[in-house]
Amino acid sequence: MISAAIIIERTEIRLGGAERSIAELMDELQTQGIRARILAAAGTPAENIAVLCSNQPTHRIQLSVFEKALLSHLADNHYDIVHSVLPFAFADIYQPRGGSYKEAMLQNAASYTNPALAQWKRWTHFFNRRRTACLYAEQALCRPTEHTIVAALSDYVKQQFIRHYQLSENRIAVIPNGINIHRSATHENGETFRQSLCTNTALKDYPNPVLFLFAANNFRLKGLREAISSMQIVIRQHPESPAFLIVAGSDDPTRYQIQAKMQGVEKRVLFLGAQGNLGSAIAGCDATILPTWYDPCSRFILEALAANKPVITTRFNGASEQYQDGKHGFIIKRPCTVRLADAINALCDTATRQSCVEAIRHDNLKEQVSITRHVGQLRHLYDIILTQKKG
């Protein structure tokens, strides 16, 4: 049986998509016969989780401190494969769940509408010592003298490493992101969610609304400003449009509530706050929208496809590679409000929306976005690396 060390900074699933993805990855690796163990800097130890820096006083462990602890652990414990989501050149595989640090910095800055502020953000990113340390470690890992394979979650991520670091293509394996498709909410869960919305919110005054779900914890980066502006265009073009934007996430909504009111669409944008069961929200809405400025391969969009929901996102989202524009939903080159409005208008048409749903089912996108498929491809990469080691 192959043994694998999975390196991650923290283990708490509540922290976000990367931690949840690793938890699902661990479960599926073990299901497929890999003896996997998480090596974390911080978190809660468990049977298959070793926490190596629990004696450190700070919440965020310095990369160099974690590296020293890892090398000490690996000297005493053998693993066939060392698979890291952090940029350590001693790893066999580097799987950057957030894409490349350089691209993340650039696109985060690009998400600011004020050009001066965007330029300021490009400069000040380098004042973040941890982020800068990770960027330099990533650059070092990509040097021609190193051998670590980058397991990219999308072709979008692959192109980042080629463009920013001139990394050779033979050191990149594109293994599209995957999710646990068996945790999707049931139709009944979705109906309960929808009924609650239609009964307890402004939706009760509108017959047959078409609900577009936006879900994120960083509203600016994920394009909520653009989504609201696109709703203004939709309502200006079609005052009787059935479109509603349903916003889920833990970010502060204040500025976006003000924006919606200033643009005259406050009755068309509903803010729900953080959702304990996002699957029910996906199941209860008609489509999903994420006009993001940056996402290596969004779990939210994959979960929507697994639930047979049409999706709208941008080329800055690696998940856009998992479906076809105009067939399963719509792909916008960048967060353009006019194009977003066109996509919303199109999916307000029942026939168009149903055609997308049927195409998603027919093309079996649910299996395509599964963690089972993802781990199967990852296992193949493990086998290749082990063969080369024996070589």
Regions from the PLM with identified roles:
Residues 41-43, 215-219, 243-257:
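Glycosyltransferase donor-sugar binding loop
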Residues 121-153, 174:
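Membrane-proximal helix-turn-helix segments that form the acceptor-binding/catalytic region
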Residues 151, 205-222, 228-231:
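Conserved donor-binding/catalytic core segment of Leloir-type glycosyltransferases
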Residues 156, 178:
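Carbohydrate-associated surface elements
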Residues 185-204:
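A short helix/loop element that forms part of the nucleotide-sugar donor recognition site in Leloir-type
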Residues 274, 293:
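Aromatic "clamp/platform" in nucleotide-sugar-dependent glycosyltransferases that forms part
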Residues 310-313:
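Short hydrophobic beta-strand element within catalytic cores of glycosyltransferases
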Residues 325-326, 330-337, 345-351:
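Conserved acidic donor-binding segment of nucleotide-sugar-dependent glycosyltransferases
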